[in-house]
């Protein structure tokens, strides 16, 4: 996919095959499009954001540059959302295999410690939404496991200040992110745009997508 010569990948879960029409499956698209991912639909019907291999690679590289270097990633969000897809692309760029936490039946915080242990040594990251972080903070073992990571990216919507404060008190390195499907995921980290990013914070200090 990132090589630029393969057909574009369409990221749609089997239970949402109705989205295939919105994503223009079967229609002619530019040859440099590597990934078609659904938008959130917050400003209208969901549509397909067409991302090139160059855009995906640049986004992943910029994220690693901001975070302190490539590392191993825990995939704890759905892999068909832009946040999960970004984790997969960052893993490919880093030459690592992500550890997947199955969230198809919900986010089980008791599985976090073992999943994070499987990441091994070196720099380690994950991407969560605020509700997942809040749930993890209710479990001491999960909280301690997240504190071992070099960064926990938080996006998908506003992160309440009490949750951020509790995470900081527990030693968890939270990075608030803002972005959208069209920007290949997070393009603003802690209010500062990534290098080469067209994004800008929304002025409130809150977060959007990963």
Feature map (PLM): residue ranges:
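AMP-binding/adenylate-forming
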Residues: 7, 53-59, 72-135, 175
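Conserved AMP-binding A3 loop
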Residues: 32-61, 68
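Short phosphate-binding/catalytic loops that engage adenosine nucleotides
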Residues: 44, 96, 172
């Amino acid at each position: 996919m990132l090589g630029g010569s393969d057909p574009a990948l369409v990221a749609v879960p089997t239970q949402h095959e109705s989205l295939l029409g919105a994503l223009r499956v079967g229609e002619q698209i530019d040859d440099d499009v590597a990934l078609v991912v659904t938008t959130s639909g917050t400003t209208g019907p969901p549509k397909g954001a067409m991302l090139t291999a160059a855009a995906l690679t640049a986004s992943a590289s910029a994220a690693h540059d901001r975070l302190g270097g490539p590392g191993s990633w825990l995939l704890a969000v759905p892999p068909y959302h832009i946040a999960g897809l970004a984790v997969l692309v960052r893993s490919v760029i880093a030459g690592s295999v992500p550890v997947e936490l199955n969230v198809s039946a919900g986010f089980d915080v008791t599985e976090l410690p073992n999943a994070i242990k499987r990441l091994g040594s070196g720099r380690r990251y994950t991407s969560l939404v605020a509700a997942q972080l809040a749930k993890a903070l209710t479990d001491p073992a999960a909280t301690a496991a997240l504190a071992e990571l070099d960064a926990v990216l938080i996006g998908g919507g506003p992160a309440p200040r009490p949750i951020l404060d509790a995470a900081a008190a527990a030693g968890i390195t939270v990075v608030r992110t803002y972005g959208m499907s069209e920007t290949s995921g997070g393009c603003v980290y802690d209010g500062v745009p990534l290098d080469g990013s067209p994004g800008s914070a929304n002025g409130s200090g809150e977060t959007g997508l990963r």
